């Protein structure tokens, strides 16, 4: 149930929230980017993300990522447990966190990046940044074992991680070409309101 609430934040929640804030000519593209990034994040999570974040630790590098032992969810069945939870439940719940984190980045580059570019960039970020950091903070890796970290509601893995990626992308892309010359009023604040309500409901599961 909590996983479904987190998924609700990604689609349609954050798609509606961002879509309403963009200009009318970009609303569909923005929502499509959120949906595509969400779907890609879930696929990458199953293929390699979960293994990097929570898979069996392998050697010295185990402090930084979990390894390749559970790629494609290998070795996990309906009897597998993660703590007291069925491991498939844990996979879905953590996959929802990965997906919402990826969707957050879209807002930093909206109206300024090609569809293919955002997919490639976020895909690389999931594999090389999100999953390893999730392992280090939540999966018993370096940060958790050395600093005894407390990550409240994804403050580090989700929010700081996605914010740094989004800010970096915004700096690389630079200002919008029409900034200051063309009105950039939000397309539909009613849609944004609905998205914000869905995000608020989803936060009950997120937290």
Which ranges hold each PLM region?
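Hydrophobic alpha-helical transmembrane bundles of multi-pass membrane proteins
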Residues: 1-206
